[in-house]
């Protein structure tokens, strides 16, 4: 489902880039780089989890769909609130959005906004994800949670036309450069849906 936004004012569209992928794929690092490059508002999706979700994950228990629904609506709502601000050109959100149905919730939460929504899927191998989560400090998502995320992961398919896939296997610098080049061109051309 690709949503065509409503734009009654014919003003330039704003952008929402949602950086998605399992724990350890580099969502926060990539989102901050995109936000900084474009001058967009940055929203850390992890900060929008209800306290119960954070406690559950901290104890090593994976979230289920019911745990995620409210969080996904919080993520979509936070983006919508930022888009309503006149001074905001765009938003960059981190959100795992592991399943297509999760991405569909984000799509539907923004469908009546004059904004172009694009997902940036950070593709990484199991080994890379475990290595990265093992080396993180002070984060509630531990390496053992990677398996539960990979078990439910529905990688974006070709019919999800609003998804940009970036491999992170060649290192941070190369993946950031590739991603920044794509989003910078897209925004500068103000591509309409």
Swiss-Prot record:
Which one GO biological process term can you cite for this protein? D-gluconate metabolic process
Which keywords describe this protein according to UniProt? ATP-binding, Gluconate utilization, Kinase, Nucleotide-binding, Transferase
Top-rank taxon: Eukaryota
Q: Where does ATP bind?
A: 21-28
**CDD domains in the record:** GntK
Which InterPro entries has this protein been placed in? P-loop_NTPase (IPR027417), Therm_gnt_kin (IPR006001)
EC numbers listed for it are: 2.7.1.12
Catalysed reaction(s) here are: D-gluconate + ATP = 6-phospho-D-gluconate + ADP + H(+)
Q: Which Gene3D superfamilies match?
A: P-loop containing nucleotide triphosphate hydrolases
GO CC list: cytosol; nucleus
Tell me the route in metabolism or biology where this protein functions: Carbohydrate acid metabolism; D-gluconate degradation
Any one GO molecular-function label of the UniProt entry: ATP binding
What PANTHER family has UniProt attached to this entry? GLUCONOKINASE-RELATED
Query: According to its UniProt record, which protein family does this protein belong to?
Result: Belongs to the gluconokinase GntK/GntV family.
Q: What is this protein called?
A: Probable gluconokinase
Organism of this sequence? Schizosaccharomyces pombe (strain 972 / ATCC 24843)
Q: What is the lineage of its organism?
A: Eukaryota, Fungi, Dikarya, Ascomycota, Taphrinomycotina
